[in-house]
Structures are given as C-alpha cells and as structure tokens.
Amino acid sequence: MRFVKKVKNMKNMISSWLNRLLYKAIMSLKIMDHLDFQMEGCSMTAKIAIVDKPIKADITDVADWFLLKGNMSNKKIQKLCYYAQAWSLTLLDQDIASHSEFEAWVHGLVNRTLYQVYDGYGWQELKITNREETMARMEKLFTPEQVEVLEAVWDTYGEYGADQLEALTHTELPWLEQRTGLGKFESSH
C-alpha cells in the first residue's frame, strides 16, 4: 500500500512539474493570436501566426542571438539552436535559419555548420566581440515571430547548463530515433 501511495505521489509531482513547464513555455510565446489553455486538463488549442517571409538568417546567426544573452559553451549553444529550430518548425512551420539540420551525436543533437565554426574553441566559452554590430544585424535578420520563438527558447532553456541540456535531448525522440542501433559512444557521423 505504501508503495502505491509513493508511486501516486511521484506521478502527481511529475505531472505537476510537467504542467508548470508546459505552462511556462506556452505562456512565454506571444506569437499566438488565440489561446485556450486549461492548466489542470492540459488541453490546449492554439492558432499560430505562420510566417511566409524568406529565411534570411543562417544557423550561426541563431547562435549569435543566444550569445548576446551571455557567454556559453559550444555544447550549450548547439542545444539552444536545436531547440530554436524545433520550436520554429512546430510553431511557425518553417526553419529558424538556413543550414539548420541537426545530427544525433554522442553528446546530443549537433549542427555540423556550428560544429565547424566553433570546433577550434574547445571547452572555452564562446562570446560576442562586437555587441552593437551583432544586435543591429539581428534586428534585420529575424522576424518578430522568430524573435518570440528565440525568446521563448531562452526563457525555457537558458538557465540550464550544457550537460543538463545534453541529458534532456537524450530523452527526446529526435535523438533517440537517430541513435537507434548505435552503441552509447558510437559515432553517428
């Protein structure tokens, strides 16, 4: 009986935590025209603004957008860019940027373009050297809807460290499906 009670308590705790996380993610998105959301029932209907503008940004621009928020490791920037791409495809029905394909590497989802750009930095934190110029460039590259997606991704995942984001991506279907048949440390590229 105690075991059943503990399992129910754990289930309720996890359900509550997931509801709060989902609520935070949805409420941080201001690109929705209409939203019916019930916290307890977790039912949601949303009408999303679809963006028909051509993609101007490259995946390295997405990385720069996040780096304006603060210095971070190559691993963390990879994961944030992955989530920006996933959220953009889901909410806007378009890529967040060009060259936005991700592969399931041992340490999570990795974009080959970003990997090539930042490979030489090793474990050093990446940073923006010219903030004003980068900020001006970002204003020209991203639509207001894309900025809302980027802000929502930052608000949801920005506080996590690189290892936490890696662990999170390892629990999600895109990584799991691409890693099917590969050993834990076997290269997929």
Residue positions per predicted region:
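Domain-edge interaction signal
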Residues: 2-6, 12-15, 26-189
